[in-house]
Swiss-Prot record:
Name of the molecule in the record: Hydroxyacyl-coenzyme A dehydrogenase, mitochondrial
Effect of residue 57 to G: Found in a patient with Reye-like syndrome; does not affect 3-hydroxyacyl-CoA dehydrogenase activity; increases KM value for NADH; does not affect dimerization
Compartment(s) of residence: Mitochondrion matrix
Organism (species): Homo sapiens (Human)
Domain of life: Eukaryota
Enzyme's top EC category: oxidoreductase
Function (record text): Mitochondrial fatty acid beta-oxidation enzyme that catalyzes the third step of the beta-oxidation cycle for medium and short-chain 3-hydroxy fatty acyl-CoAs (C4 to C10). Plays a role in the control of insulin secretion by inhibiting the activation of glutamate dehydrogenase 1 (GLUD1), an enzyme that has an important role in regulating amino acid-induced insulin secretion. Plays a role in the maintenance of normal spermatogenesis through the reduction of fatty acid accumulation in the testes.
C-alpha cells in the first residue's frame, strides 16, 4: 500500500510539474534580485513597460541607492521622451517609480511573482544557494532566470526542482539603452518557458536573440576573445593601445576601441569571464590569461568605475 501511495504521489507531482511547464506565462509581476546597475536597470525597464516589480537586495541602504539611481535614469528618459510636455514626463517618472517595491527578503516576495530575474555576484555557489532557497517559496508557475554573463545556466538551474522553468536572460549595460537580450535555453528549458521569456523581452521593448547554453552565449563568446587578442597585440609591443583603439574605430567602424571598451565594461569583469573559461578549457589559446589584465586587476584598477584601467580618467 505504501508503495502504491508513493507511486501515486510521484505521478501527481510529475503531472503537476508537467502542467506548469506546458503553460505559456504572460509575465506581469517581476522580482529582480540584485540592486546593482544591472538589476536596477532591469527593474526600471520592467516597471516602465507596465510590469509590477519588486527589487531585492541585502540592505535598505543599497535599495535606497538603487531607487535613487532609477529615478535619475527615468528623469533622463522623460526629458527626451516628453520634451514638450514636462508634466507628462513627471507623471511618467512617478507612475513608474510607484510600481517598484523593494525588499531585503527575497523568499517573502516570490510567492506570487511570475518571473524571478537574478542579477547578483558572478559566483556559482552563491547563485545556487539563492535559487535553492527561492525554489521552496516561489509559486509553481514562476519562471527563474539568471542574468549571468559567464556561468552555465544549467549549473545554476541544477540547484532547483524547476529546470524546465529555468533559463538565461542576459541583458546588457546600460539596460535602459541597450536593445539586446540573449535568451538562453538549456536542454531542460521547456519551449513554453522559452517563449514566455521571448515575449517578456519584447514587452520590454528589447530585441531577443536565442542561444544554447554555451560559454559566453553569443556576444561575449565573440567579444571577449577579440578584447583579449587586442591586449596580446599590445603586450607583444606590436602596436600601442591608442593606435589599436583608433584602428578599430576608424578602420572597422566600431564606436569604441577594445581598450576603451575594456575600461567601460570593467577589467575585473573581463578577467572573471576569462578565468572561468580558462578553467573549463585550459588548452584553448583564446582563453589564456593576460599578465597586463591580471596586474591591473590586482592593483584594483578596473577601468572607468575606479578612475583608472588601461587609461586614466579624471
Amino acid at each position: 500500500m505504501a508503495f502504491v501511495t508513493r507511486q501515486f504521489m510521484r505521478s501527481v507531482s510529475s503531472s503537476s510539474t508537467a502542467s506548469a511547464s506546458a503553460k505559456k506565462i504572460i509575465v506581469k509581476h517581476v522580482t529582480v534580485i540584485g540592486g546593482g546597475l544591472m538589476g536596477a536597470g532591469i527593474a526600471q525597464v520592467a516597471a516602465a513597460t507596465g510590469h509590477t516589480v519588486v527589487l531585492v537586495d541585502q540592505t535598505e541602504d543599497i535599495l535606497a541607492k538603487s531607487k535613487k539611481g532609477i529615478e535619475e535614469s527615468l528623469r533622463k528618459v522623460a526629458k527626451k521622451k516628453f520634451a514638450e510636455n514636462l508634466k507628462a514626463g513627471d507623471e511618467f517618472v512617478e507612475k513608474t517609480l510607484s510600481t517598484i517595491a523593494t525588499s531585503t527578503d527575497a523568499a517573502s516576495v516570490v510567492h506570487s511573482t511570475d518571473l524571478v530575474v537574478e542579477a547578483i555576484v558572478e559566483n556559482l555557489k552563491v547563485k545556487n544557494e539563492l535559487f535553492k532557497r527561492l525554489d521552496k517559496f516561489a509559486a509553481e508557475h514562476t519562471i527563474f532566470a539568471s542574468n549571468t554573463s559567464s556561468l552555465q545556466i544549467t549549473s545554476i538551474a541544477n540547484a532547483t526542482t524547476r529546470q524546465d522553468r529555468f533559463a538565461g536572460l542576459h541583458f546588457f549595460n546600460p539596460v535602459p539603452v541597450m536593445k539586446l537580450v540573449e535568451v538562453i535555453k538549456t536542454p531542460m528549458t521547456s519551449q513554453k518557458t522559452f517563449e514566455s521569456l521571448v515575449d517578456f523581452s519584447k514587452a520590454l521593448g528589447k530585441h531577443p536573440v536565442s542561444c544554447k547554453d554555451t560559454p559566453g552565449f553569443i556576444v561575449n563568446r565573440l567579444l571577449v576573445p577579440y578584447l583579449m587578442e587586442a591586449i596580446r597585440l599590445y603586450e607583444r609591443g606590436d602596436a600601442s593601445k591608442e593606435d589599436i583603439d583608433t584602428a578599430m574605430k576608424l578602420g572597422a567602424g566600431y564606436p569604441m576601441g577594445p581598450f576603451e571598451l575594456l575600461d567601460y565594461v570593467g577589467l575585473d569583469t573581463t578577467k572573471f569571464i576569462v578565468d572561468g573559461w580558462h578553467e573549463m578549457d585550459a588548452e584553448n589559446p583564446l582563453h589564456q590569461p593576460s599578465p597586463s589584465l591580471n596586474k591591473l586587476v590586482a592593483e584594483n584598477k578596473f577601468g572607468k568605475k575606479t578612475g583608472e584601467g588601461f587609461y586614466k580618467y579624471k
